[in-house]
């Protein structure tokens, strides 16, 4: 089986459905004997350019190991899901299990927000 990194962008109005979508894709992969090495929910982020008149979208990254039939089924699911604006599947040489550079940035942003919120809570 081959290793893949999948990034898909979800319509911002459908952000509440992202956990269910991830669960559905996880079920598809594992039911066909594949493995999931990493799933990262990058959250709602600014797009580099407008897609369908949208400036922001919800990003999800998955690192998986599966066969071609499973990959074809996933790609078919992405194409016919109206909530998925774009998807990208890249073949990897090995499994990636550590946090991606994008996830590290997301964690840094969350830490800054938490640090900024603590002094205001201390004053109250």
Swiss-Prot record:
Any one Gene Ontology cellular component term annotated for this protein: cytosolic small ribosomal subunit
Key words, A-Z: Ribonucleoprotein, Ribosomal protein, RNA-binding, rRNA-binding
Protein's name in the database: Small ribosomal subunit protein bS6
Gene3D superfamilies in the cross-refs: 3.30.70.60
Biased composition (Low complexity): 114-124
Region (Disordered): 97-124
Membership in a protein family: Belongs to the bacterial ribosomal protein bS6 family.
InterPro entries attached to this UniProt entry: Ribosomal_bS6, Ribosomal_bS6_sf, Ribosomal_S6_plastid/chlpt, Transl_elong_EF1B/ribsomal_bS6
Domain of life from the UniProt record: Bacteria
Biological process annotations from GO: translation
Taxonomic placement: Bacteria, Pseudomonadati, Pseudomonadota, Betaproteobacteria, Burkholderiales
Function: Binds together with bS18 to 16S ribosomal RNA.
GO molecular function, one term: small ribosomal subunit rRNA binding
Gene that this polypeptide is encoded by: rpsF
